[in-house]
Design a protein with these regions (language model features):
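Coil-to-alpha-helix initiation sites in intrinsically disordered, low-complexity, charged segments
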Residues: 23-28, 189-190, 196, 200, ...
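Low-complexity, compositionally biased segments
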Residues: 7, 18-20, 84, 175, ...
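A structural signal for short, hydrophobic/glycine-enriched beta-strand patches
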Residues: 3-5, 54-195
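Short, solvent-exposed mixed-charge patches
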Residues: 228-229
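Generic low-complexity, intrinsically disordered sequence content enriched
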Residues: 10, 43, 105-106
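A transmembrane-helix-recognition feature enriched in membrane-embedded lipid enzymes
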Residues: 194-224
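N-terminal Lys/Arg-rich, disordered targeting/topogenic segments
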Residues: 1-30
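N-terminal type II signal-anchor transmembrane helix
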Residues: 20-60
Length: 229
């Protein structure tokens, strides 16, 4: 009679260890893939932001306007003042101030800017419908169609100009839009030393990307509850 070997542990199959090893390998592969994708996205975002910043900082007013009219997109300091100076200099025959707050009257704008009353009466139009840059583009297109303009000078802050021109050209590809950047006026120091300017550029870059997404998808997920700045 064979002796039963008590106390000897049964031999384990290698199948369980192999399955666990393959599971760990798959998790490691997925984790590496996620990290690589995140790093690639972060790099692309950084490169895009650098390109956007260089574009904003290198924007200069055109040497020759050759434009029929002027539109100023409200929301930043000095935009309307610059547009009125350009109108007085003959850069266009009319000026549209797009995105005016409904509670603001033409006379209050004239007094604030110190504009000439005759110039306001003859040659300045006010748009009250736009709440954001997309709305500016829609409002401007209607105004252009009413007057039959072909070349329009667009006045807005330098950081806002890329998005403003993109929205206008997307909404109205038949019109030639010429950008006129208004400096932010933050002083002589480097832009990266000014935290407020860095935040403005970062926020505007995200909006710039959002405008491209909306143009491609045709979706407008969010509409602002108040006027954009």
């Amino acid at each position: 009679m064979m002796k039963n070997e008590l106390g000897k542990p049964p031999e384990k199959s290698g199948n369980g260890d192999g399955a666990r090893g393959r599971s760990v390998t798959r998790r490691g592969f997925v984790l590496r893939a996620v990290l690589v994708a995140a790093l690639a996205a972060l790099t692309a975002f950084g490169v895009g932001f650098a390109w956007f910043t260089v574009r904003v900082l290198s924007e200069r007013p055109p040497s020759i306007y050759e434009t029929d009219a002027i539109v100023v997109l409200t929301g930043g300091a000095r935009r309307i003042d610059e547009a009125l100076l350009l109108l007085a200099e003959g850069a266009g025959e009319r000026l549209l101030i797009s995105g005016v707050n409904p509670s603001t009257t033409p006379e209050s704008i004239r007094k604030t800017t110190g504009g000439d009353s005759q110039l306001f009466e003859c040659c300045v139009d006010f748009g009250y419908e736009a709440l954001d840059t997309y709305g500016n583009a829609v409002e401007t297109r209607k105004w252009i169609e009413e007057h039959g303009y072909r070349r329009v000078l667009v006045v807005t802050s330098a950081y806002h100009l890329p998005r403003g021109l993109f929205e206008l050209r997307h909404i109205d590809p038949e019109t030639v839009f010429v950008g006129y950047p208004v400096p932010l006026g933050e002083g002589a120091g480097p832009w990266y030393d000014n935290l407020r300017y860095v935040k403005v550029l970062g926020s505007e870059y995200l909006k710039f990307l959002g405008a491209h997404v909306r143009a491609v998808t045709g979706l407008r997920v969010l509409r602002p509850a108040k006027q954009e700045t």
